[in-house]
Amino acid sequence: YEVHLILKGSVIVGIFTGNPKDEPLHYGEVFSIWTNLATGYGMIAGYQTFYNHAGDQDLKKIIEDFIQCARDEVKQLEKILKTNGVALPPAPPERPEARIENIPPGARFNDPEISAALSMDAAAGLVSCSQVMGMAIREDIGLLYAQFHTAKAQLGAKLLRLNKEKGWLIPPPLHVHHPLH
């Protein structure tokens, strides 16, 4: 990468030029990518566990979509960290498939619980992606997280629709406007 330094008053200002991928990551970008990668590893294992516990076939399909989304993100984040000489965080092992009948009913996550956890993850993921998009100075990092954001928003919309169809959505108190007479 090429850095041009310009002296303005008593402050040196760095101006990056050329391909953003040739620019160094700043510490916030490194920390965010590393943290998101560690989180992605954990989510894959957690979603595999949810898949084993889920009984509803529509929910299982969405869980597969969440796993694939996380795997896609992990692959891209690993590449960025490796390219920039940053050690990868540890990853839990993949979860083996289990038969739902072999999980005792009291020890099993039920479908509405799984769906609620996925909804929470989708919402938190949107916030996390937005935060990285806002602090990134490398255009490629900001755009990558914009892609992650879009994928999470689409998964969240599918999940919301499923929650409504299955009757799993527990709405907060609703504000209903009643006209004054």
Identify the meaning behind each predicted range:
Residues 29-51, 100-147:
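Acidic/histidine-rich alpha-helical segments that form the ligand environment
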Residues 25-33, 57-75, 111-114, 139-153:
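Alpha-helical scaffold segments that form or flank carboxylate-/histidine-based iron centers
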Residues 16-18, 30:
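Active-site flanking loop/helix segments enriched in acidic
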Residues 57-93, 155-166:
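Conserved alpha-helical segments that form or flank metal/cofactor-binding pockets of metalloenzymes
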Residues 1-12:
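Short, Lys/Arg-enriched N-terminal segments with co-localized hydrophobic residues
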Residues 121-181:
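Preference for long, well-ordered alpha-helical segments
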Residues 12-16, 79-116, 120, 171-181:
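Carboxylate-rich helix-loop segments that flank metal/cofactor sites and access channels
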